[in-house]
Amino acid sequence: MNTANFPWLTTIILLPIAASLLIPIIPDKDGKTIRWYALIVGLIDFALIVYAFYTSYDFANPDLQLVESYPWVPQLDLNWSVGADGLSMPLIILTGFITTLATLAAWPVTLKPRLFYFLLLAMYGGQIAVFAVQDLLLFFLVWELELIPVYLLLAIWGGKKRQYAATKFILYTAGGSLFILLAALTMAFYGDNVTFDMRSLALKDYALNFQLLLYAGFLIAYAIKLPIIPLHTWLPDAHGEATAPAHMLLAGILLKMGGYALIRMNAGILPDAHAYFAPVLVVLGVVNIIYAALTSFAQRNLKRKIAYSSISHMGFVIIGFASFTDLGLSGAVLQMVSHGLIGASLFFLVGATYDRTHTLMLDEMGGVGKRMPKIFAMFTACSMASLALPGMSGFVAELMVFVGFATSDAYSSTFKVIVVFLMAVGVILTPIYLLSMLREIFYGKENEELVSHQQLIDAEPREVFVIACLLVPIIGIGFYPKLLTQMYDATTVQLTARLRDSVPTLAQEKPEAPKVSLSAPVIGN
């Protein structure tokens, strides 16, 4: 059967969205039918993603594949244009995997199940669209549409301060989206031909000052979603009030949208401006790693502690992105996927712990490991993955960023030594706050008041299955990272070469900018 011309990406995007529209008419009294329906739809869509990937995707091809383009507004060159390359394909697979598991994690949800699973499936298709669309205006639209399900998931099913957290989320992200719209319209109408096609936009000859302005606009929008300090404060509040499945989607997928867009738009379309902004990004990445790690250490609320840990880990993505090496950029992509798996697992376990203890304050926990040995073991394993234990995906990703940046010829030796030292400090801080967290939850003397009022039952099979599904790729990638890196190596090599080609212009026009040896080989070639 020839599947090369089948509209895989359109089908994968529209299937969960169309399925969500049927939820209001499905007969169901107690929510059980709806949740099984949502799970089956998620599994079918994920199976289609995997099948399309294995039958129609070529690892060695760095360009867009599975390309589809259907006219929408021909006068403005607006098209339903989708495609996948090495940058987007791993994140599409991650989206299908995490969202399907989040559907299973949502099993205990009983409040308005029809609306909940409607939002979950609609969000599923929308998130895949963000990683697949190749039309900039269409990208803006699906980026904006993603805000609605997340807002409602926070505002309806969140904790006591859910309205505050949801409002803060929508204000931050919608405000950032204005910069995307302004930049998109400006780029589209620049020059003689009007177009929103990303590939055509990348070929336009923008003046350097114009590139810098566009880059800054995109950076603000994507820095909010990644997030980059100081535009991060919405995330701890959102995580502090979210339910377990919303946690998994926030940590596992939503943050990756910011990292993906930063690489796709800022580096892919505006490489000359990237050469100017790269040193600033490195500094911001270091601030993310150190500041968020120290803040996480000080948190007494379990959800907020893990939220700041996520911000810290995103610092490695930023530094790898700005390294000008194949290895660093490859590590940044690997870190996004790795953190998606690890972050989803930790927040799921935080939810499982809260369901039993009914508290998030570490001061009110203690000694529960004896009563919940399975949750204790799973929490420990996922925490080890988060602190980058060798043999797990986080170790490989952070090591690649370390080596990629350290071997970069785009920065002075002094600057590299300082940055690598501070990155190492962040790596040391991570086990300090994670191991202390485990000690306060599971070790020590039991909180007698907690034990007397709560039934501390251990993990049920559904919870063990979700964590097992997440740990398998975490460990698999840790021992054999080529499982993942082979998907995108060709794309990252091509993108890094384009970024390095832009640096001679920088060196000529601005001598004080980071030095680059034009004759030096690109790392990984």
Curated annotation (Swiss-Prot):
Places the protein is found: Cellular thylakoid membrane
EC category: translocase
Task: Quote the InterPro entries the UniProt record gives.
Answer: NADH_Q_OxRdtase_chain4, NADH_Q_OxRdtase_chainM/4, NADH_UbQ_OxRdtase, ND/Mrp_TM
Q: Which GO terms describe its cellular component?
A: plasma membrane-derived thylakoid membrane
A GO term for molecular function? ubiquinone binding
Q: What is its EC number?
A: 7.1.1.-
Which family would the database say this protein is a member of?
A: Belongs to the complex I subunit 4 family.
Q: What is this protein's record name?
A: NAD(P)H-quinone oxidoreductase chain 4 1
Can you name the source organism?
A: Trichormus variabilis (strain ATCC 29413 / PCC 7937)
